Curated annotation (Swiss-Prot):
Residues 395-411, 431-457 have a biased composition (Basic and acidic residues). Pfam families: SAM_1, zf-CCHC. The gene is ZCCHC14. Residues 28-43 have a biased composition (Gly residues). The keyword Oxidoreductase does not apply. Keywords: Metal-binding, Zinc, Zinc-finger. The keyword Transmembrane helix does not apply. This is Zinc finger CCHC domain-containing protein 14. InterPro entries: PX_dom_sf, SAM, SAM/pointed_sf, ZCCH14_SAM, ZCCHC14, Znf_CCHC, Znf_CCHC_sf. Residues 200-219, 416-425 have a biased composition (Low complexity). Transmembrane segments: none annotated. Residues 61-78 have a biased composition (Polar residues). It comes from Homo sapiens.
Length: 949
């Protein structure tokens, strides 16, 4: 045994001491012949290999690792047994066995268990029939061998080693000879209490082993042998194969021996009680079939222990069911003397973890860890960009995406919000909540979406975001579009594929910047191939709403459905759910046209809009406080999308870039992948490659700016068009350039998108949200505002500034969920032009630094200028988590004040000097954070430097 039992050295003395003491006492009390064996651990019992193994654990050859533990259990059991004799055992306690006749062997389904029937003649002339399993008989013989080494019983027990199937089979081979031997046992052996108990009817299950106090060693041996299946458990109905282990446990329990932990004892009742019952009751055979399940369960315990490298203690627990094993408490573990303190601590910790897991499973039986029944694929938070998990594990997955009419969308909010909120921890309370939510919602949605579920949209997770992966959790929501006939829609594309297929512009991005309590943003991306997006007909039908994703309002995140019309130029409808609180009505732009729509009408518009190519609903929550988006717990999301990235739209000349959609949600978060990249943008997302942004040199369509007060949260749909001139930068930090503001405006205007043309001084105000934006009219694009990305000037410095989606710029850095941190990012490029000029971007200032938000001078600082853009405060965590890199808590120092510092304060954020604004600063842009977390050196576009300090 020692050779096989890693814990032997630890248990050796303790176990030997206990066993020897028990054996000695049992032999002295009831044992006569066994007396010899008792004295010597190895010496007395050497004749009986089984006994030898067991009693002299040190010497014991390896019967099996489990044996040692079993022995220990037996030892405790023995103590129990010792007490048993004292207890009334029925007539058998007074009578002895006169003769044993073997009636026959019967094989049960489980061949491992052969039942042996005996007819026992008692000294009182009574005859009883006893049926024992082969394992019990083997154990019994092994015990006798231990008690009566001179009888050479070991010959009859080819393998006393243990419960191993191999050994059991061997036992069966020689079982006959053993049984025959039992019939011819000498009277002094038959009179032994152990024999009496074994043959007492109640004992059949376990009695035989535990009963004989005098023969504890025998019972131990039996247990060790694997006969252990024996009845103690048997009485309890425990399969005999297990029962051996169980009975071991029971004995200990009964005996209060160190092994009380054996749950079997508990389950059976005290081992003693069992024995008593066994004595009184006719022998009960454990159906082998019962044993099998237990065996499997035991294997489960063994495997579990093996993972913890504690399998050497398996014998201590093998009599326990997995349920009982997992329910062991610290107190229970302390009762196991054979466990070391380290093992107890380890087990305690692991058992607690297991309990928590099981509780979680119970709570969320329907939610698999990664893919909830709702079909939301949870990407465990990992910073790395991994293959996208297909959101659609099942139709349920589609549920996650509300393709339904808007009214159905609401139910989704809860789940999506949960998901988004749980971005940081894929599993956790949130996960539980989600699962419960998802289960209900799934049911609800499944019904709702059965039709739409026909086609599941692949959900692409742009893991690229994960780069900042501070918010590793990306939620991929499978999108179902009935209309989507494109088979490709059904197959989730790996993020790489997404990026690769720029044509798939119709990526649904669910970007929820959830600055949920965690202040982390989850990026939910729903992408489907363009075709998978609603077909034009559907859009025309107004099915768009169905295809459109509903934004989780609770998070105030915007969900963008970019349903690029299959035709590249088809204008995209942008609906921004302004924060409900915001006074501004959402602006919907169709291509060049802009409509002002009240938030309340958004749903309607979505439905009615023939081309719901892009539907953005921002939950008002983010802008909940129209006046200060910054304060809003959840920043709105700003998205730049080109519905179809037709090159044409890219053409700077086009006034309307129907394909390009810019959605600004007050807290501006741009899904990096979604953001359009300037052709130059190194960061450009491959997926977005089609985006015209890069090509466009002009500002965005003025219409995006139409709402003079960008304050209105409504997102403006900015079509990328080159704006011939940039409005003169206004001193106010407000976005001066519409195009830029259109990009950033949402972020810039607190909750409101800064759609207001730069010319409107109100831009500053728009930050406040306080001013309702003027209904955006398809105002002609204000003169293109080319802001110097390097210095933030309106272009007077001579460096060419191209309005570029700054987001593109940042996206990379913030590939993480909080892709667009510009709200937080005070990158000069952002600041200076609000967007990095494509050149600059290309120029290699990898991340433009936002200049002082004030650079209202046409600097598209919209991000900065709409300090709200920097409504970063709420987003800071988000950003920090996401981009860890850029986290600038101060972010645009004034970003918190949606009204960024205005002209009153002329200090330059960038260089710290006073008398000029950062937008006019000639120094490289520096982070606005006062803390000066870092200074980004932004190379002027002329210099093509891709690195940022």
């Amino acid at each position: 045994m020692a050779s096989n039992h890693p814990a032997f050295s630890f248990h050796q003395k303790q176990v030997l001491r206990q066993e020897l003491t028990q054996i000695q006492s049992s032999l002295n009390g009831g044992g006569g012949h066994g007396g010899k064996g008792a004295p010597g651990p190895g010496g007395a019992l050497p004749t009986c290999p089984a006994c030898h193994k067991i009693t002299p654990r040190t010497e014991a050859p390896v019967s099996s690792v489990s044996n040692s533990l079993e022995n220990a259990l037996h030892t405790s059991a023995h103590s129990t047994e010792e007490s048993l004799p004292k207890r009334p055992l029925g007539k058998h306690s007074k009578v002895s066995v006169e003769k044993i006749d073997l009636k026959g062997l019967s094989h049960t389904k489980n061949d491992r268990n052969v039942e042996c029937s005996f007819e026992v003649l008692w000294s009182d002339s009574s005859i009883t029939s006893v049926t024992k399993s082969s394992s019990e008989v083997t154990e019994f013989i092994s015990k006798l061998c231990q008690l009566y080494p001179e009888e050479n019983l070991e010959k009859l027990i080819p393998c006393l080693a243990g419960p191993d199937a191999f050994y059991v089979e061997r036992n069966h081979v020689d079982l006959d000879s053993g049984l025959r031997y039992l019939a011819s046992l000498p009277s002094h052996v038959l009179k032994n209490d152990h024999v009496r108990r074994f043959l007492s009817t109640s004992s059949p299950p376990q009695q035989l082993q535990s009963p004989s106090p005098g023969n504890p060693s025998l019972s131990k041996v039996g247990t060790v042998m694997g006969v252990s299946g024996r009845p103690v458990c048997g009485v309890a109905g425990i399969p005999s194969s297990q029962s051996g282990a169980q009975h071991h446990g029971q004995h200990p329990a009964g005996s209060a021996a160190p092994l009380p932990h054996c749950s079997h004892a508990g389950s059976a009742g005290s081992a003693l009680a069992y024995r008593t019952q066994m004595d009184t009751s006719p022998a009960i055979l454990m159906p082998s079939s019962l044993q099998t399940p237990q065996t499997q369960e035991q294997n489960g315990i063994l495997d579990w222990l093996r993972k913890l490298r504690l399998h050497k203690y398996y014998p201590v627990f093998k009599q326990l069911s997995m349920e009982k094993f997992l329910s062991l408490t610290e107190e229970d573990l302390n009762k196991f003397e054979s466990l070391t303190m380290g093992a107890k601590k380890k087990l305690k910790t692991q058992l607690e973890l297991e309990k928590e897991k099981s509780e979680r499973r119970c709570l969320n039986p329907s939610a698999p860890p990664l893919v909830t029944s709702s079909g939301v694929a949870r990407v465990p938070p990992t910073s790395h960009v991994g293959p996208v998990q297909s959101g659609r594990g099942s139709h349920a997955a589609e549920l996650r995406v509300e393709v339904e009419q808007p009214h159905h969308q609401l139910p989704r909010e809860g789940s999506s919000s949960e998901y988004s909120s749980s971005s940081s921890s894929p599993m956790g309370v949130q996960a539980r909540e989600e699962s419960s939510d998802s289960a209900e919602e799934n049911d609800r949605r499944v019904e709702i979406h059965l039709e739409s579920s026909d086609k599941e949209k692949p959900v692409m997770l742009l893991n690229h975001f994960t780069s900042s992966s501070a918010r590793p959790t990306a939620q991929v929501l499978p999108v179902q579009n009935e209309a989507s006939s494109n088979p490709s829609g059904h197959h989730p594309l790996p993020p790489q594929m997404l990026s690769a297929a720029s044509h798939i512009t119709p990526i649904r991005m669910l970007n929820s910047v959830h600055k949920p309590e965690r202040g982390s943003a989850d990026m939910k991306l729903l992408s489907s191939s363009v075709h998978s997006l609603l077909s034009l007909e559907e859009r025309n039908k107004g099915s768009g709403p169905r295809s459109s994703m509903k934004v989780d309002k609770s998070f105030g995140s915007a969900m963008m459905d970019v349903l690029p019309a299959s035709a590249p130029h088809q204008p995209v409808q942008v609906l921004s759910g302004l924060s409900e609180s915001s006074s501004m009505s959402p602006t919907v732009s169709f291509g060049p046209r802009t409509k002002v729509v009240h938030a309340s009408t958004l749903d309607r518009v979505l439905k009615t809009a023939q081309q719901p190519a892009l539907v953005v609903e921002t939950s008002t929550a983010a802008t909940g406080t129209p006046s200060t988006v910054l304060h809003a717990a959840r920043p709105p999301i700003k998205l730049l999308l080109s519905s179809s990235v037709p090159a044409d739209s890219a053409i700077s000349g086009q006034t309307s870039c129907p394909n390009n959609v810019q959605i600004s949600v007050p807290p501006a978060i741009i899904n990096p992948r979604t953001a359009l990249y300037t052709a130059n943008t190194k960061v450009a997302f491959s997926a977005m490659s089609s985006m015209p942004v890069g090509p466009l040199q002009g500002g965005f369509c003025a219409n995006s700016n139409t709402a003079s007060p960008s304050s209105h949260p409504s997102t403006s749909f900015a079509n990328m068009a080159t704006l011939p001139s940039c409005p003169a930068p206004s001193s106010s930090p407000a976005l001066s350039s519409v195009p830029e503001s259109s990009f950033y405006s949402s972020s810039g205007g607190g909750g409101s998108t800064g759609n207001i043309p730069a010319s409107n001084p109100n831009h500053h105000h728009h930050h406040h949200h306080q001013q309702p934006p003027a209904p955006p009219q398809p105002a002609p694009p204000p003169p293109g505002c080319i802001v110097c990305t390097s210095c933030g000037c309106s272009g007077s410095c001579g460096s060419s500034g191209l309005t570029v989606s700054y987001a593109n710029y940042f996206q990379h850095p913030f590939s993480g969920p909080s892709v667009f941190t510009f709200p937080f990012l005070p990158f000069s490029p952002m600041c200076s032009s609000g967007y990095v000029s494509a050149q600059q971007y290309g120029g290699g200032s990898t991340f433009p630094v936002v200049h002082a938000p004030y650079s209202s001078s046409g600097t598209p600082d919209p991000v900065l200028s709409g300090q709200s853009t920097f409504a970063v405060p709420p987003m800071q965590n988000f950003m920090a988590g996401t981009a860890g890199v850029y986290q600038t808590q101060g972010l645009v120092g004034s970003s918190n004040g949606s009204s960024h510092k205005k002209s009153g304060n002329l200090s330059c954020y960038n260089c710290g000097a006073t008398g000029h604004r950062a937008q006019d600063c000639k120094q490289p842009s520096m982070d606005f954070n006062r803390p000066g977390t870092f200074r980004l050196k932004y190379a002027p576009p002329a210099e093509s430097l891709d690195s940022t300090d």
